[in-house]
Swiss-Prot record:
It is an enzyme of class 2 (transferase). It is found in: Cytoplasm. GO terms for biological process: one-carbon metabolic process; S-adenosylmethionine biosynthetic process. Keywords: ATP-binding, Cytoplasm, Magnesium, Metal-binding, Nucleotide-binding, One-carbon metabolism, Potassium, Transferase. Residues 98-108 are annotated as: Flexible loop. GO terms for molecular function: ATP binding; magnesium ion binding; methionine adenosyltransferase activity. K(+) binds at residue 42. This is S-adenosylmethionine synthase. Mg(2+) binds at residue 16. It comes from Parabacteroides distasonis (strain ATCC 8503 / DSM 20701 / CIP 104284 / JCM 5825 / NCTC 11152). PROSITE patterns: ADOMET_SYNTHASE_1, ADOMET_SYNTHASE_2. GO terms for cellular component: cytoplasm. Pfam families: S-AdoMet_synt_C, S-AdoMet_synt_M, S-AdoMet_synt_N. Belongs to the AdoMet synthase family.
Length: 428
């Protein structure tokens, strides 16, 4: 019997994502000037106010106000009527030094014996239902909001009323074998300007006219653009019977941090697999790679994606766990959901992963090049399923004479650089 599965995403202007992006921008700034920085930075955003808190060990000085305001401006909160605006909002910082008790458990004379920054379990997941080995419902949800933001920033005349805050949700019907059959429902809620109608009509009538315009634009402008980004077999899932809910409350003028308080780390399912697979509970943003909540989750995704791409299974979940101060993981667990393509148990597959991948924190950092300022880009539209690329970044501050320019690789955990080795090990 078929079933329905739903995933959601939120835009870069969603308050929780504003917080995530500020935290990761601060992390990047510290790493740009000191690659050995230890950072755990949390952000709260609300009406007209940003609050920064956390622990840092670094030789770098970062102008946290400058960084936070730059992120807010980049997202698009640049008008006073938003009641959260880059130049005028308050920025309060309570960032202090990292605990010595934690640091003694992490740093070692032999870097490869560097202990995990905390205990916990982390998961990586991959499925071959999309070209980027991500669950389709989540991938579509991200694409809807990525394209909406692109229209807002690059083609404002198309949908001139758009504001930064938005959410999406996609429901897909699957068959018993986990194959997508059709898109059932699409939900898009986007913040918009107040609509002032011509004289002689009420505000209610003006709101209804605005709602009608937004719904039409989503169906006629946004959906076709997103559909065109996918291969033919995914395009075929779009159909005339899709249920659309566009701004279902009828109005979405008050939004962003003025509408809801935002906090770092509250969109961990959006950040990962949209409810597919599993999650260990640890958030990513604002954490340097000594925190295995982040680095080991990326490494587990790297394993799962390369294993599925190599043909070991059509779907795979990988769990890894750590004790604080201990380098070697407690375990590696694999679940192929009965979709393995090799004549092995999941336990036997996990045993081979131990032989292929060094999962000590320092080895992960080096393999995935995680000591670079690569994190701001991860903080919106998902940490997984993104395209690996090399970019040039420049960091500058009014307090430092020379800017820092560096070439960095983004989303290294999405590279299929171990697929051939896996094929050799598994005889594929």
């Amino acid at each position: 019997m078929s079933y329905l599965f739903t995933s959601e995403s939120v835009s870069e202007g969603h308050p929780d994502k504003v917080a995530d992006q500020i935290s990761d921008a601060l992390l990047d700034e510290f790493l740009a000037y000191d690659k050995n920085s230890k950072v755990a930075c949390e952000t709260l955003v609300t009406t007209g106010q940003v609050v920064l808190a956390g622990e840092v060990k670094s030789s770098a000085y970062v102008d946290v106000q400058e960084v936070a305001r730059g992120v807010i401006e980049k997202i698009g909160y640049t008008k006073s009527e938003y009641q959260f605006e880059a130049k005028s909002c308050g920025v309060f910082s309570s960032i202090h030094e990292q605990s010595g008790d934690i640091n003694r458990g992490v740093e070692r004379a032999d870097p490869y014996e560097q202990g995990a920054g905390d205990q916990g379990m982390m998961f990586g997941y991959a499925t071959n239902e999309t070209e980027n080995y991500m669950p389709l419902a989540l991938d579509l949800s991200h694409s809807l909001l990525w394209e909406l933001a692109k229209i807002r920033k690059e083609e404002p005349d198309l949908m001139p009323y758009l504001r930064p805050d938005a959410k999406s949700q996609v429901t897909i019907e699957y068959d018993d074998n986990g194959k997508p059959l059709r898109i059932d429902t699409i939900v898009v809620s986007t913040q918009h300007d107040e609509f002032i109608g011509p004289k002689g009509i009420s505000q209610k009538e003006a709101d209804e006219a605005m709602q009608k315009r937004i719904a039409l634009d989503v169906k006629k402008i946004l959906i076709p653009r997103v559909k065109a980004q996918y291969p033919a077999h995914v395009q075929a899932l779009f159909n005339d019977n899709i249920i659309y809910h566009v701004n279902p409350t009828g109005k979405f003028v008050i939004g962003g941090p003025h509408g809801d308080t935002g906090l770092t780390g509250r969109k961990i399912i959006v950040d990962t697999y949209g409810g597919k697979g599993a999650h260990g509970g640890g958030a990513f943003s604002g954490k340097d790679p000594s925190k295995v909540d982040r680095s080991a989750a990326y490494a587990a995704r790297h394993i799962a994606k390369n294993m599925v791409a190599a043909g070991v299974a059509d779907e795979m979940l990988v769990q890894v766990s750590y004790a604080i101060g201990v380098a070697k993981p407690m375990n590696i667990f694999v679940n192929t959901f009965g979709r393995a393509k090799v004549n092995m148990t999941d336990g036997e597959i996990a045993a081979k992963i131990w032989d292929i991948f060094d999962m000590r924190p320092k080895a992960i950092e080096e393999r995935l090049k995680l000591r670079n300022p690569i994190y701001f880009e991860t903080a919106s539209y998902g940490h997984m399923g993104r395209k690996p690329q090399t970019v040039t970044k420049t960091f500058s501050s009014r307090y430092l004479q020379k800017p820092v320019t560096c070439d960095v690789e983004l989303f290294t955990w999405e590279k299929l650089d171990y697929a051939d080795k896996i094929k050799d090990v598994f005889g594929l």
